[in-house]
Amino acid sequence: GKENTVVLFFPLAFTGVCTTELCDDTAGLAQYTGLNAEVIGISVDSPFAQEAWAQKEKIGITLASDLNKTTTKAYDVVFPMLAGVGDTSARAAFVIDKAGVVQYAEQTATPKDLPNFQAVKDVLAKLK
């Protein structure tokens, strides 16, 4: 691609920690623009749920639905059970460079923990 990409996996829309993660990111999108990176949020929610959530919370990053869970499984970030829902995405962050190589990968210990966004920004700064 022409840009570095930050891929953020999150378990479910309309949950508190996910909202904090992506709203913080939406507010900080200018920082990622300066680092020449596109930010994409991925969850196993339907695109309709994601759209409703994005509008309600004014989330300005690209959201991608992984309803069939193939991307979540390909990145090996499956969380077995959350709020009665099986096989959601774990909370995770990846930085993928312009050549498609993963330069940073982090899966948080629990869905309540946020990824280390400073580490993500540090990796992006080196990739300029």
Show the residue positions of the predicted features.
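Chalcogenol-based redox active-site neighborhoods
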Residues: 1-128
